[in-house]
Amino acid sequence: MDTAQKQRWAITLSYDGSRFYGWQKQADGVPTVQAALETALAQIAGEAVSTTVAGRTDTGVHATAQVVHFDTTAARPQQAWVRGVNAHLPEGIAVLHARQVAPEFHARFDAYGRHYRYLLESVPVRSPLLKNRAGWTHLKLDIGPMRRAAALLIGEQDFSSFRAAECQAKSPVKTIYRADLTQSSGLVRLDLHGNAFLHHMVRNIMGALVYVGSGRLSVEGFAALIQERSRLKAPPTFMPDGLYLTGVDYPEAYGIIRPQIPEWL
């Protein structure tokens, strides 16, 4: 195959993580986002397509604006990679945008920022309508201490206390630019913007913040937890249900659209 004829495309997609066993293809053939997407892309391209993602997501984790790139020799109009691919995707995944990009564009390595939201339901009885869409605790949470604790995350730090044991990142040092907490009608929203995130980092942070909000961990204890740089004394990893990848930042020259977070979220 003549590689000079290849085109590189970037697509932005949204998916319901509760329907899939994470992003990455698996040998046993269980449904994953990558497997479903590559199958649909191949239908339009008329050839096998391999994808590279901005950031892999675990089972149950959602995305409103995941970014993927792929190479193909198939000359197709932009809408073929949107409406055409969507026609071949299973329920729970949709391509939002597609754009031909420079051959050197890389969905993972060119990303300089990532945005996550954790949606948490804090009510005595979990709503059946929000199951798989939001995390849940029956505990009443005090948002004030949670906000003060979240503010301690901002900056470049070693986040080993919020790192999964199986994390493959070369360094636990990451930079958090923004950590906002809001509360409305029994729903707590945690918005994090950072240069990159460790495996389970957001879910581990959420678990610790729930401890703070429920009085099981003080703000000072949260600060000490960060300094411990160890998972051994940290609260458990919180459920994946409420975690959403809501955006990826790229240099403007690539023209990658980052959609607004949906109003329902």
UniProtKB/Swiss-Prot annotation:
Q: Name one GO molecular function term.
A: tRNA pseudouridine(38-40) synthase activity
Q: Where does substrate bind?
A: Y116
Which HAMAP family is this protein grouped with? TruA
Give UniProt keywords alphabetically. Answer: Isomerase, tRNA processing
Class of enzymatic activity (EC top level): isomerase
- Which InterPro entries does the protein's record reference? PsdUridine_synth_cat_dom_sf (IPR020103), PsdUridine_synth_TruA (IPR001406), PsdUridine_synth_TruA_a/b_dom (IPR020097), PsdUridine_synth_TruA_C (IPR020095), TruA/RsuA/RluB/E/F_N (IPR020094)
> Mind listing the GO biological process terms from this record?
tRNA pseudouridine synthesis
User: Is Isomerase set as a keyword in this record?
Assistant: yes
Species for this entry? Neisseria meningitidis serogroup C / serotype 2a (strain ATCC 700532 / DSM 15464 / FAM18)
Q: In this UniProt entry, which cysteines form S-S bonds?
A: none
Active site annotation, chain numbering: D58 (nucleophile)
Function of this protein? Formation of pseudouridine at positions 38, 39 and 40 in the anticodon stem and loop of transfer RNAs.
Q: How does it assemble?
A: Homodimer.
Reaction it catalyzes = uridine(38/39/40) in tRNA = pseudouridine(38/39/40) in tRNA
* Taxonomy, superkingdom: Bacteria
Name of this protein: tRNA pseudouridine synthase A
Cross-referenced SUPFAM superfamilies: Pseudouridine synthase
User: What family does this chain come from, according to its entry?
Assistant: Belongs to the tRNA pseudouridine synthase TruA family.
Name the Gene3D superfamilies for this protein: Pseudouridine synthase I, catalytic domain, C-terminal subdomain (3.30.70.660), Pseudouridine synthase I, catalytic domain, N-terminal subdomain (3.30.70.580)
Q: What is its EC number?
A: 5.4.99.12
